[in-house]
Regions:
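Short coil/turn segments at alpha/beta junctions that flank glycine-rich nucleotide-binding fingerprints
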Residues: 54-55, 109, 130, 171
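Amphipathic alpha-helical packing segments from all-alpha helical-bundle domains
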Residues: 96-99, 118, 125, 129, ...
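Amphipathic alpha-helical segments used for helix-helix packing
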Residues: 127-145, 195-199
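Generic hydrophobic, amphipathic alpha-helix propensity
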Residues: 40-49, 65, 90-98, 102, ...
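Conserved hydrophobic residue
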Residues: 57-58, 174, 202
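C-terminal peripheral helix-coil segments that are non-catalytic and often amphipathic
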Residues: 1-29, 122-126, 159-170, 189, ...
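Hydrophobic alpha-helical connector segments
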Residues: 89, 103-129, 182-186
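Helix-turn-helix
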Residues: 43, 47, 51-85, 89
C-alpha cells in the first residue's frame, strides 16, 4: 500500500484563493434595500385599488400588483410586508378620505337631523365621484385581514359620527336602538343608494333615490 503524495501547492492554492476573495470583497457594501422613492407607495396603492376591484382581493397576488405598478416585489414589501398590510393601508387611507368628505359637510350650529342628512349626502356625493373606492370598501366589509390597529384608527376617524347618532337617538329622530345598529344601517342604506344610482335601473332620479333611502332611517 502506497501513501498518496500530497501536492504541496494544493493547500497553499486554496489559501491564496481565499485570501484573494477576501481582498476583493473587503469594503464592499451589502446589497442596498429598496429605496423609498417618492410616489412608489402611491403607485402601489392605486394599482392595488384597480386590481382588487376588478379581480377581488383574494384573487390578486402581490406579484401582479408590483408588476403592474412598475416596481419590484422588494419595493412593494418594503412598504407593505404582506398583502393584509397592503389591504389595511388602502382601506384606512380611503376611510380617512371618506371621513374628511363627510366631516366637511358638518356644521355644529345646525340641528341634529340636518347635520345627519348633510353627513350622509356628503358621503353619497363622495361615493358617486369615487365608485372604485366604494366597491373596495364594500369588499372589505367582512374581510378578515383588516387588523385591529386599522379598525381602531378607522373608529377614531368616525367617532364624532357615533356621537351624532347618539344625539339623534336622544332627540327621538331615530329609534332607540344601539348606535352600532344605526351605524350599520346607515352604511347599508347608503351603499344601496349608490348602487341604485349607478345602475340607473329604477327609473328614479338620484335625488329621489337619496330622499327615499334617507326616509328609511327616521323614526316613524
Amino acid at each position: 500500500m502506497t501513501t498518496k503524495r500530497r501536492d504541496p501547492d494544493r493547500g497553499g492554492g486554496r489559501k491564496r484563493n481565499a485570501a484573494a476573495a477576501i481582498r476583493n470583497t473587503a469594503g464592499r457594501q451589502p446589497a442596498p434595500a429598496p429605496k423609498s422613492t417618492p410616489g412608489n407607495r402611491e403607485k402601489i396603492l392605486d394599482t392595488a385599488l384597480r386590481l382588487f376591484t376588478r379581480y377581488g382581493v383574494d384573487a390578486t397576488p402581490t406579484s401582479r400588483i408590483s408588476r403592474e405598478a412598475g416596481v419590484s416585489t422588494g419595493t412593494l414589501f418594503h412598504y407593505f410586508p404582506d398583502k393584509d398590510t397592503l389591504v389595511g393601508a388602502l382601506y384606512l387611507s380611503i376611510k380617512k378620505e371618506v371621513a374628511g368628505a363627510v366631516r366637511h359637510q358638518d356644521a355644529l350650529s345646525l340641528p341634529t337631523k340636518e347635520r345627519f342628512v348633510h353627513g350622509i349626502r356628503g358621503y353619497i356625493a363622495w361615493g358617486m365621484a369615487n365608485p372604485l373606492k366604494v366597491r373596495f370598501l364594500d369588499q372589505c366589509y367582512n374581510y378578515p385581514g383588516i387588523g385591529e390597529d386599522v379598525q381602531r384608527a378607522v373608529y377614531d376617524e368616525f367617532s364624532w359620527m357615533a356621537g351624532l347618532i347618539g344625539a339623534a337617538i336622544d332627540e327621538g329622530i331615530v329609534p332607540d336602538l344601539p348606535v352600532e345598529f344605526h351605524a350599520t344601517m346607515v352604511y347599508k342604506i347608503t351603499s344601496g343608494i349608490l348602487a341604485l344610482i349607478e345602475s340607473g335601473s329604477t327609473g328614479l332620479s338620484p335625488d329621489e333615490i337619496i330622499g327615499n333611502g334617507l326616509a328609511m332611517l327616521w323614526k316613524k
